[in-house]
Amino acid sequence: MKLRLKIPALWWLAAFLPAVSPLAVAQDAPPEEPRRYFRYSLSTIDDVTVYSGLQVPLPIVLNQFLVEPTLTFRYKPVWSFSTSLIGVADTYTDSFTQLRVKEAYAGASAGNFDITVGRRMVRWGTGYAFTATGVLDPPRMPTNPTDRLNLNEGRDMVKADFVHGSSALTAAWSTAALAPASADLHDTTAFRYNVLVHGFDTSLIAGDDRGGDAFGGFTFTRVFGEAWEIHGEAAWREHEAILGGAKYTTTNGITFIGEFFTPPNIPYFQETSTPLNGRQHYLFLTAGKSRLRELPGWKQWDLSVSTVANLNDLSYTAIIDATRRFGNHFSSYLHMEVPAGNSRSEYGATPFTAATSVGIRFQL
């Protein structure tokens, strides 16, 4: 009698298991990516800069109000479009408003190939405050390497990428037709080969500026554990330019960055209005910490101190940055620059003794 009861039970169990298994597999399968993806953001900055000891006949207060909307749209994994605009209202010697296009590009992907057309910001150089190989990058400003007002704009280009395993090949052509005349840009053709070799992220870069010079370069980045990183660049454009740097993060979250940069004395690398004699040598040092302490009232603070120095004329600029966050959307900041040096030196010739910027940022 007991045997008769067990046999039907086994039949029911055998019939039920095949029905359950596909259900379990379906529940374990990752969800499919949406066919359409849309994301937008909005940020505003109200910035006031006060110049102390101004040595030229200009107002001592500069006020800027910036609005930056950004949106990204993707259809399937193939098509994409992204744009980032910035509206600037400036009150200084005169009041004016302008609209800048930071980025506006469309992209298509097919297998290992990606094609991008439009204005795009890229970062080929590995340097934090300087770069020798960032031929298509926005310009680096050593006293403001993070671009705190988000004023950098991309280059207008057609770019194609081919990725295979741990290597990638990029070909880009950039036009200067839509760039401001003050930017002093040329039509640029550039190639970049990136590959990971024994833990070193390396790149070979080559190209040519129309009406200018051909150039070539090499970059590398290497991370050691969770604390150390080294990076470097070497480039040739009429003469050699060398950059070397390192980053170290302590166990309590303090980050130190140091860079040494020596460019040749040619117009491409000379960003100052004062003519410089011969090859220059620069040093950049910074120490900073996000979330000063994991305690209420402290973890909302970020603080960093930096200095950039010209080792030839011994002039320098000291920089202090402090940020205080209020919730998820608001933050305030302080940015101060104090130049020092002989009046005929690079940083000593700065026409003020200090520039102090304070601002409020809103992000949505």
Show the residue positions of the predicted features:
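Detector for outer-membrane/organellar transmembrane beta-barrel domains
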Residues: 33-34, 197, 221-309
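Transmembrane beta-barrel strands of outer-membrane/channel proteins
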Residues: 38-48, 83-87, 117-119, 171-175, ...
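Surface-exposed strand-loop-strand hairpins of Gram-negative outer-membrane beta-barrel proteins
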Residues: 43-64
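Residues that define the transmembrane beta-barrel architecture of outer-membrane proteins
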Residues: 59-67, 97-102, 111, 152-156, ...
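Outer-membrane beta-barrel architecture
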Residues: 68-70, 104-107, 159-161, 192-194, ...
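Repeated loop/turn-to-beta-strand initiation elements of outer-membrane beta-barrel proteins
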Residues: 77-81, 112-115, 166-171, 197-204, ...
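Outer-membrane beta-barrel "beta-signal"
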Residues: 283-289, 336-338, 350-364
